[in-house]
Amino acid sequence: MKKVVFITGGTGGHIYPAISIAKKMREQNIDILFIGTEHRMEKELVPKENFRFIGLDILPLKSIKSVIKMIISVFKAISILNKEKPDKVIGFGNYITIPVLIAAIVLRIPYYLQEQNCTMGMANKYFYKKAKKIFIAFEDTLELVKEKYRSKFIVTGNPLREEFYTKNSKEER
C-alpha cells in the first residue's frame, strides 16, 4: 500500500484543502499520515476525519526559542519519516512544512506542494524549486515564478470539501 504524508496546519485555509485531497486519496487505498503542530486547530480537525496525526512542537520563526524548536522538529521529522517510510510528502505551505520538507530532502523522499493563495507563502517560495510538482489555485501565481520552473506548476484551483459539491434544496431556497 502506498503511503503519503500530508504537512498542514495553522488555519482552515491550509487544513481543509489538505483534508479534501487526503479523503480522495484514502478512497484509492492510500495510507495517509498528517503532520502538523501540537498547538493549533489541525490537532483536532484531522483526527475528527479519521486520519492519523502527529503534532510537532513548532512555532513561527520569530524568536530564538522558535528557531530551537524548528531544529528539534527537523530531527523529529527525520525520525518520523524514517519510521513511516512514505512514498511521497505533500506540503500545504506555512512554517509547519519547513522541518518535514527538510527531512524529506535529507531522506530523498519526493515532495509536492500545494499553494492556496495567489502569492506564494515563504515556505512554498523556498521549497518549490526542488518539488516534483506544485499545485496552485491561481494562474497569476506563475507571474512570480522564474520561467525555468513553470513547467512544475499545475493550476488546479483550490480543493473544496465534499459538502460544497452536494446540493441541499432547502438551503438553496
Regions found by a protein language model. Give the residues of each.
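Conserved nucleotide-sugar phosphate-binding/catalytic loop shared by glycosyltransferases and other
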Residues: 3-9, 26-69, 154-160
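Residue-level detector of alpha-helix initiation sites
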Residues: 11-12, 16, 94-96, 118-119
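Short amphipathic alpha-helix
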Residues: 14-25, 41
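Hydrophobic/aromatic ligand-binding patch that stacks against planar heteroaromatic rings
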Residues: 24, 45, 103-104, 126-127
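An aromatic- and histidine-rich active-site surface loop
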Residues: 40-44, 88-107
